[in-house]
């Protein structure tokens, strides 16, 4: 009896050479709060991320109004359950301005909390992309947040991790401010689109090691 012919791959078939799992930790804005399309900036980023030979899985682990200390206490226990033992594991940390509401808030303590997250991830061989906090309409709050944003940026830079500064370009951005005013302080469709644009154009593809889309 002649051997059965092997079925050829269908047109467009590609072999998945890279298996990537991304755990994204952050607050309610990471989860798309304020976006009437319920996609959020994170969904927009993922929609613009595809490459031949790459299988990407993502897991959103969001807690509203979370401080860096709270994030640091939970991220590994939650993210590690989503990570793979055989593929690539990556971490996205979306920071908020919640540390400003602490009674004994200080940039030094916030720096240490973020440093602990990045150091733990580095020890486990997990590349990290950090998205900095976004500005509000409260200028006095923004002045304090500017200091915190600079501290976060320094922590990430010292450890060679990618830091996307969302605060500086959005602080005086008319469309961002109009979106916050219309949404009761939350970014809407336009605001989430602006965050996504910053992430996509500030090192996302290089961090993942995939080519940028041509269109």
Tell me the role of every PLM-derived stretch:
Residues 2-64, 77-86:
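Serine-esterase "nucleophile elbow" of acetyl-processing enzymes
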Residues 134-215:
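Catalytic His-Asp segment of secreted/periplasmic serine-dependent ester chemistry enzymes
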Residues 35-38, 69-111, 136:
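Oxyanion-hole/transition-state-stabilizing segment in secreted/luminal serine hydrolases
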Residues 94-100, 117-147:
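Active-site segments of SGNH/GDSL-like serine hydrolases
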Residues 29, 61-66, 92-102, 157:
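Cell-envelope and extracellular/periplasmic
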């Amino acid at each position: 009896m002649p051997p059965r012919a092997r079925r050829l791959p269908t047109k467009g078939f590609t072999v998945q050479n890279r298996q990537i799992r991304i755990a994204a930790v952050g607050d309610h804005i990471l989860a798309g709060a304020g976006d009437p399309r319920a996609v959020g900036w994170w969904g927009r980023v993922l929609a613009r991320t595809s490459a031949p030979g790459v299988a990407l899985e993502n897991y959103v682990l969001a807690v509203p109004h979370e401080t860096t200390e709270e994030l640091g206490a939970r991220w590994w226990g939650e993210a590690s359950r989503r990570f793979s033992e055989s593929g690539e594991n990556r971490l996205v940390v979306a920071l908020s301005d919640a540390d400003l509401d602490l009674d004994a808030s200080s940039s030094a303590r916030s720096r240490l909390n973020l440093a602990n997250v990045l150091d733990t991830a580095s020890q486990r061989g997990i590349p990290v992309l950090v998205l900095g906090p976004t500005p509000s309409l409260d200028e006095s709050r923004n002045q304090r947040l500017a200091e915190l944003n600079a501290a976060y940026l320094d922590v990430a830079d010292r450890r060679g991790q990618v830091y996307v500064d969302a605060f500086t370009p959005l602080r005086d951005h008319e469309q961002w401010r109009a979106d916050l005013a219309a949404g009761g302080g939350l970014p809407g469709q336009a605001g989430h689109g602006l965050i996504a644009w910053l992430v996509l154009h500030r090192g996302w593809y290089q961090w993942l090691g995939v080519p940028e889309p041509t269109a």
